[in-house]
């Protein structure tokens, strides 16, 4: 449940994080990192109470220590949205609104470990929050940014499912369901426990048979485009909140009409278990890997930062970085040939060439090219084998002087040619590596 990647895997994970960061910044989101702990009272008040929160305590604290009691009120955050809301309230006077931030940070949940579910994990979140009112167009922008970001990663295509909690809540209220929040949480479990499981749980919540059947009619509507809204209306349930949700969903789907077919679909089964979501909600899954569950999710909230002096509505999404890279590595969906960021290994075949090897190494590093130098003379085969084993693309053989210049060997092709450390550039770079990985992912996806 606490993944530790090999160096070649960690390189891929960092490249994915770098690409996510770059895409977030293209849309004007600013970087942020919040503390790892939050008051337990804050963490447990935001829904999903079945999530196991890790409590922070001091092992050496005495039973009568007031500090120990204070520590017991702290827990590790299980997502990044709750800490973000607390941060906004705390720094309200120092922020410019609408406030747009991204976080790529760890979270912790005491879940049963399995593929795609970890007790310690990395998430990449974006949120935008404003005073009093947040434009609905931000809901569509979140989906567009998600699509563009995930399309740039070395993963199979992702379908983003969209719903609006006002639809689900308004529909249940139109059915005269007495307590809609527990019913919504149950409906959100459809993909995990199936229609029969949902029916049994709703029966236990004292819903009538007619209410249960009608609720299942809603969440089992086939996902699709704007036509899904018409199918909901055909069910004949009426409520003002339902009408508001359908209008908002129609607006978002219209805004996203230029995305590739299948990139974003309306799906009535997406409810989201967190109580703070009040409008648009999203979940995305990799095509051909739906068994993994959602690789991104999020939604709109109207009351999350309730401690602020004014109402602060917002909308945000989260990408499950650890879930994505865990599947990539488990299914060999992305190449991991390089165990180091090193581009060049400078060889030292004999002691008298050490000075030249040092000059080359320093010159390449000064130009921003990651470079290692072999530290003691040894057989060239040994040095070249080291470069090959670590996936270093180039080996640099220092020349003996004016009559013999430097040589650079391409470790993949075996080709070699003259090298000048003041001008030479590697033919491979991170962008090329990502491009190759993307092609391979598409072939497998």
Located regions from the model:
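Auxiliary tRNA-acceptor-end handling modules of aminoacyl-tRNA synthetases
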Residues: 1-10, 63-64, 68
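Short clusters of hydrophobic/aromatic residues that line enzyme substrate/ligand-binding pockets
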Residues: 5, 54-56, 295, 304
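Positively charged, Gly/Ser-enriched RNA/tRNA-binding surfaces
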Residues: 12-27, 38-41, 69-71, 79-95, ...
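Polyanion/phosphate-binding surface patch
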Residues: 32, 36-74
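Glycine-rich, histidine-containing beta strand-loop boundary motifs that form or position
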Residues: 33-36, 162-164, 399
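Acidic, His- and aromatic-enriched active-site or binding-groove loops in soluble protein domains
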Residues: 52-66, 175-203, 207, 286-288
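Glycine-rich, mobile lid/loop segments that gate access to catalytic sites or pores
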Residues: 159-176
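Short, solvent-exposed helix-helix connector turns and helix-capping sites enriched
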Residues: 164, 191-194, 224
């Amino acid at each position: 449940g606490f993944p530790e990647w090999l160096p070649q895997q960690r390189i891929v994970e960092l490249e994915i994080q770098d690409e996510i960061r770059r895409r977030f910044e293209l849309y004007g989101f600013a970087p942020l990192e919040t503390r790892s702990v939050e008051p337990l009272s804050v963490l447990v008040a935001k829904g999903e109470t079945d999530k196991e929160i890790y409590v922070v305590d001091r092992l050496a604290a005495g039973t009568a220590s007031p500090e120990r009691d204070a520590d017991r009120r702290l827990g590790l955050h299980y997502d990044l949205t709750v800490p973000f809301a607390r941060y906004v309230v705390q720094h309200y006077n120092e922020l410019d609104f609408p406030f747009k931030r991204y976080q790529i940070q760890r979270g912790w949940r005491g879940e049963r470990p399995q593929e795609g579910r970890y007790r310690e994990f990395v998430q990449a979140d974006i949120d935008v929050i404003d005073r009093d009112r947040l434009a609905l167009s931000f809901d569509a922008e979140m989906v567009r940014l998600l699509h563009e970001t995930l399309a740039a990663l070395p993963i199979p295509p992702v379908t983003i499912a969209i719903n609006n909690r006002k639809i689900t809540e308004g529909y249940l209220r139109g059915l005269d369901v007495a307590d809609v929040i527990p019913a919504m949480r149950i409906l959100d479990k459809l993909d995990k426990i199936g229609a029969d499981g949902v029916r049994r749980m709703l029966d236990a919540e004292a819903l009538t048979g007619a209410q249960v059947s009608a609720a299942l009619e809603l969440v089992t509507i086939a996902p699709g485009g704007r036509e899904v809204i018409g199918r909901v209306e055909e069910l004949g349930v009426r409520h003002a909140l339902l009408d508001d949700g359908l209008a908002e969903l129609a607006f978002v789907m219209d805004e996203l009409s230029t995305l590739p077919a299948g990139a974003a679909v309306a799906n009535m089964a997406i409810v989201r278990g967190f109580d703070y979501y009040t409008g648009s909600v999203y979940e995305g899954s990799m095509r051909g890997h739906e068994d993994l569950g959602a690789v991104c999710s999020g939604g709109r909230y109207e009351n999350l930062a309730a401690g602020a002096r004014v109402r602060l509505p917002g909308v945000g999404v989260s990408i499950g970085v650890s879930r994505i890279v865990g599947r990539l590595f488990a299914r060999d969906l992305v190449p991991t040939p390089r165990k180091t960021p090193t581009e060049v290994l400078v060889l030292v075949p004999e002691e008298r060439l050490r000075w030249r090897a040092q000059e080359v190494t320093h010159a390449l590093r000064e130009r921003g090219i990651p470079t290692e130098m072999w530290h003691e003379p040894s057989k060239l085969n040994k040095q070249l084998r080291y470069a090959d084993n670590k996936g270093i693309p180039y080996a640099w053989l220092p020349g003996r002087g004016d009559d013999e210049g430097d040589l650079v060997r391409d470790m993949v092709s075996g080709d070699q040619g003259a090298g000048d450390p003041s001008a030479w550039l590697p033919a491979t770079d991170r962008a090329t590596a990502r491009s190759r990985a993307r092609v391979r992912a598409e072939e497998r996806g």
